[in-house]
């Protein structure tokens, strides 16, 4: 999960949402245990003024940003947890992949995440339930009786809670392949 700044009005020309926080957990597909994590703030380079407003909303302080890492270092941390073709990159919604891809493009760095490894758990949950709307992460964890923690809308806590929901769904017998098969059928 990433925290980024998005604002509809008053954006500079060419504006894109910069990642200002990353949170990730790595879950072993067999044991369903957490085997790694990332929790860092990320320096905004292109739109620091706009990022400041996003930091205020997400309760990120200037002191937090003193320990922030560079975008390229964040990608290296992702590479340490993610093995292309062998690891799913799971997030709640499709925006996380898009914001990483755009950040890579703007920084002129290679995106370490393959699009075919990206799993939008919100879309998968929607299909699993047969809903016509997308459920929010908080409501989905409540529906599945997942014991959540931390603050909502902070990158690491959202990643940890998404991971807990994924583990619950997998433990209940859900398979990610079922999502891709069903999604492919819908797009025929």
Regions inferred by a protein language model and the residue ranges of each:
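Short, glycine/acidic-enriched loop or turn micro-motifs at the edges of active sites
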Residues: 1-4, 123, 161
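Conserved non-catalytic scaffold segment of RNase H-like nuclease domains
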Residues: 1-97, 112, 142-143
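Active-site-proximal helix-loop-helix substrate-binding element of RNase H-like nuclease domains
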Residues: 42-43, 48-58, 62-65, 122-159
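Short, surface-exposed recognition loops or helix-turn segments adjacent to catalytic cores
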Residues: 94, 114-121, 151-159, 179-182
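Substrate-recognition/cap helix-loop segment adjacent to the acidic, metal-dependent catalytic center
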Residues: 95-117
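A structural signal for well-ordered alpha-helical segments within the folded catalytic domains
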Residues: 98, 160-163
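Active-site catalytic microenvironments for nucleophilic, acid-base chemistry
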Residues: 103-107, 127, 143, 165-172
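Acidic two-metal-ion nuclease catalytic site recognized across multiple nuclease folds
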Residues: 165-188
């Amino acid at each position: 999960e990433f925290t980024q700044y998005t604002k509809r009005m008053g954006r500079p020309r060419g504006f894109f949402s910069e990642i200002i926080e990353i949170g990730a957990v790595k879950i072993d597909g067999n044991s369903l245990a957490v085997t790694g994590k990332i929790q860092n703030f990320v320096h905004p380079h292109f739109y620091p003024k706009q990022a400041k407003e996003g930091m205020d909303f997400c309760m990120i302080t200037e002191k937090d940003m003193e320990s922030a890492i560079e975008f390229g270092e964040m990608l290296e941390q992702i590479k340490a947890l993610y093995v292309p073709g062998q690891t799913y990159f799971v997030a709640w919604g499709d925006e996380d992949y898009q914001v990483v891809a755009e950040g890579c493009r703007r920084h002129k760095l290679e995106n370490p995440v393959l699009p075919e490894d990206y799993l939008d758990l919100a879309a998968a949950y929607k299909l699993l339930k047969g809903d016509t709307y997308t459920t929010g992460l908080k409501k989905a964890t409540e529906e599945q009786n997942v014991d959540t923690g931390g603050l909502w809308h902070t990158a690491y806590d959202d990643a940890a809670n998404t991971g807990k929901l994924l583990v619950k769904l997998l433990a209940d017998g859900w398979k990610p392949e079922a999502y891709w098969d069903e999604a492919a059928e819908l797009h025929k």
